[in-house]
Amino acid sequence: MADRNLRDLLAPWVQNVPARALREMVLDSRVAASGDLFVAVVGHQADGRRYIPQAIAQGVAAIIAEAKDDATDGEIREMHGVPVIYLSQLNERLSALAGRFYHEPSDQLRLVGVTGTNGKTTTTQLMAQWAQLLGETGAVMGTVGNGLLGKVNPTENTTGSAVDVQHVLSGLAGQGATFAAMEVSSHGLVQHRVSALKFAASVFTNLSRDHLDYHGDMENYEAAKWLLYSTHHCGQAIINADDEVGRRWLAKLPDAVAVSMEDHINPNCHGRWLKATDVDYHDSGATIRFASSWGEGEIESRLMGAFNVSNLLLALATLLALDYPLSELVNTGARLQPVCGRMEVFTAPGKPTVVVDYAHTPDALEKALQAARLHCTGKLWCVFGCGGDRDKGKRPLMGAIAEQFADIPVVTDDNPRTEEPRAIINDILAGMMDAGHARVVEGRAEAVTNAIMQAKENDVVLLAGKGHEDYQIVGAHRLDYSDRVTAARLLGALA
């Protein structure tokens, strides 16, 4: 677009830059087109500067490249008539550059960030739904996808590149979004993908084992999450006081809102707070009574399990802290919809209840099983596996949890990737006291089918790990498969 100009874009950092109109900002030279700005970053796997000739051949208007080797910060060169501006620490600056390029979209809507191991998707979706019920135009960004509510487009990563994030936010603002709830991953924080965003509020859900193949240990993982509050424009902090890490952080964040289901709040010690005073679980969800700095209330929820009550309370506390009226939030709470693939319930007359959930960490699996147990009067089945080419340490932990909390654990495949499926299953079984108690069924579709066909009417069958995903990765192939579709089809056929 003509209103994007290279000189204006770089004004805070570099002087004497030529005035060039810019169309789009791209990190991938393969999609660069005439009039684009190509940004050549040095990544973990590739050096974008190697692709500068390709970008020039494709007609880009200008290039910004990492200042390394013989180039200095702020240096301007020209290659085949194309200006190349070198900036040091380009990855760290990318969010700010993209923010300027897309006219600071986080200033144009109310943006809430949600970080934590589990609960990010449900909390963001509930928050956006709730804000929309109160008159906002809600949008979400995260694992399930990006977009206005009801018009979400699938994504590859929880948090896209720094350019993607600003581009998507700009698009949402352009579509009329006034409120956006965004999942913020630990990878995204460490890699500076959201460093220039202006969050109105930042929510911490919990911290448990995940991504240790990337972070190395829990200390580094916690430090990555803490970056949202220590180095970002986090706005109002909303912290889960039931989490041990959350309680540590509350001690460092005196203005944070503390949220609890387990009475981990002393109103004399914290600033503002919200806590559940009573939760009644029933067949169709839960009745939640709460007290808070803003007053008391009762909400009927269609969500399953204690952790979803926690997610709902975090969403409620965030909206209260952003000055949405308590009475309107209470009056609309019953209209909140369960989230796709997150403790999503499938039923048919006379058949077992099937619950599809994304739980793929030890903590999430334990919580999903505990949640399902609250609504189960018969046997609790758990069909699950672990991803290949990922953190192997969690496999025996998940095996132990399934054995402890399910009546009938069924171990199967879940994106084995390049690993041998049976080897992954054996790693899971190694965590069980009595591996012979578990049913082993290689091939996820067969495992799910067998469980649903064999379960009785008052049983609950938890299908854990895939949630909203509609694929299975075997070797290098991405095959069509969905727990949700399989469950719906089987119950429909059985009914």
Swiss-Prot record:
Hey, which pathway is this one from? Cell wall biogenesis; peptidoglycan biosynthesis
Pfam families assigned: Mur_ligase, Mur_ligase_C, Mur_ligase_M
Name the Gene Ontology molecular function terms of this record: ATP binding; magnesium ion binding; UDP-N-acetylmuramoylalanyl-D-glutamate-2,6-diaminopimelate ligase activity
Q: What is its main location?
A: cytoplasm
Give the modified residues of type N6-carboxylysine. 225
Residues that coordinate or bind ATP: 116-122
Cross-referenced InterPro entries = Mur-like_cat_sf (IPR036565), Mur_ligase_C (IPR004101), Mur_ligase_C_dom_sf (IPR036615), Mur_ligase_cen (IPR013221), Mur_ligase_N (IPR000713), MurE/MurF_N (IPR035911), UDP-N-AcMur-Glu-dNH2Pim_ligase (IPR005761)
Q: Where does UDP-N-acetyl-alpha-D-muramoyl-L-alanyl-D-glutamate bind?
A: 27, 29, 44-46, 157-159, 185, 191, 193
Task: Could you list this entry's UniProt keywords, alphabetically sorted.
Answer: ATP-binding, Cell cycle, Cell division, Cell shape, Cell wall biogenesis/degradation, Cytoplasm, Ligase, Magnesium, Nucleotide-binding, Peptidoglycan synthesis
The reactions it catalyses are: UDP-N-acetyl-alpha-D-muramoyl-L-alanyl-D-glutamate + meso-2,6-diaminopimelate + ATP = UDP-N-acetyl-alpha-D-muramoyl-L-alanyl-gamma-D-glutamyl-meso-2,6-diaminopimelate + ADP + phosphate + H(+)
Q: Which GO terms describe its biological process?
A: cell division; cell wall organization; peptidoglycan biosynthetic process; regulation of cell shape
Q: Coiled-coil annotation: which residues?
A: none
Q: Where in the cell is it found?
A: Cytoplasm
- Motif range (Meso-diaminopimelate recognition motif): 414-417
PTM comment, free text: Carboxylation is probably crucial for Mg(2+) binding and, consequently, for the gamma-phosphate positioning of ATP.
Which cofactors is this protein said to need? Mg(2+)
The first-level EC class reads ligase
Indicate whether Magnesium appears among the record's keywords: yes
Q: Its domain of life?
A: Bacteria
NCBIfam families in the cross-refs:
murE, PRK00139.1-1, PRK00139.1-2, PRK00139.1-4
Q: What does this protein do?
A: Catalyzes the addition of meso-diaminopimelic acid to the nucleotide precursor UDP-N-acetylmuramoyl-L-alanyl-D-glutamate (UMAG) in the biosynthesis of bacterial cell-wall peptidoglycan.
Q: Which family does it belong to?
A: Belongs to the MurCDEF family. MurE subfamily.
| Family annotation (HAMAP family) | MurE
Protein name, UniProt field: UDP-N-acetylmuramoyl-L-alanyl-D-glutamate--2,6-diaminopimelate ligase
User: Species name for this entry?
Assistant: Enterobacter sp. (strain 638)
